[in-house]
């Protein structure tokens, strides 16, 4: 049985960005909703393990990698939402630049998120340099790893509203894309 690490971004100590409506941080939002992805993956026949970097003893991305590695996952997916200047919005997925399987999974999940949220498709973001977001998470995971940024929920009102309104469908779509990734087989 294939195992998927569903890593909640940030930590209880550092919640990450806060939604424009101030209801949730990244950590609290995904803590409330990640179970929907887990349930759908399990319904599809996968083992899904919800985890967080704080369980590996820290709050930085390297601890997220350590926790995903400890789970023994075949795929690691870390859940976030974005923030930037108020004019920027959309959906993007980050992956390790040298991982063909990571890129394949990223393509499938990015397409699924865009289909549900109907926000601008900001595309895939290959992570290669130490200055890139999540560098140590990607560098240190031993399996294909992704970081999902489905919306600019901390800086764009439309993105925030859309993420909240469609989170259930989004969770099902992400699980479906993961299923498609495994069914198509690794590169």
Where are these regions (language model features)?
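Conserved SGNH/GDSL esterase-like catalytic core that processes O-acyl groups on lipids
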Residues: 46, 61, 122, 126-132
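Active-site-adjacent substrate-binding region
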Residues: 101-128
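Short, charged, low-complexity patches
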Residues: 30, 102, 106, 163-171
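Short glycine-/small-residue-rich flexible loop motifs, especially phosphate/cofactor-binding loops
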Residues: 38, 65, 111, 135, ...
């Amino acid at each position: 049985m294939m195992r998927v690490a569903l890593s909640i971004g940030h930590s209880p100590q550092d919640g990450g960005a806060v939604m424009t409506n101030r209801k949730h941080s990244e950590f609290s939002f995904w803590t409330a909703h990640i179970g929907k992805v887990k349930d759908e993956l399990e319904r599809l026949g996968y083992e899904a393990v919800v985890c967080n970097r704080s369980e590996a003893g820290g709050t930085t991305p390297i601890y997220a990698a350590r926790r995903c590695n400890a789970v023994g996952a075949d795929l690691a997916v870390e859940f976030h939402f974005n923030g930037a200047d108020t004019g920027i919005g959309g959906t993007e997925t980050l992956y390790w630049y040298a991982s063909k399987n990571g890129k394949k999974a990223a393509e499938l999940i990015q397409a699924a998120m865009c289909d549900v949220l109907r926000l601008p498709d900001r595309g895939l973001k290959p992570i290669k340099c130490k200055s890139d977001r999540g560098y140590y998470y990607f560098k240190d995971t031993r399996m294909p790893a992704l970081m999902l940024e489905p919306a600019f929920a901390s800086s764009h009102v439309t993105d925030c509203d859309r993420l909240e309104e469609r989170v259930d469908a989004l969770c099902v779509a992400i699980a479906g894309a993961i299923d498609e990734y495994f069914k198509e087989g690794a590169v």
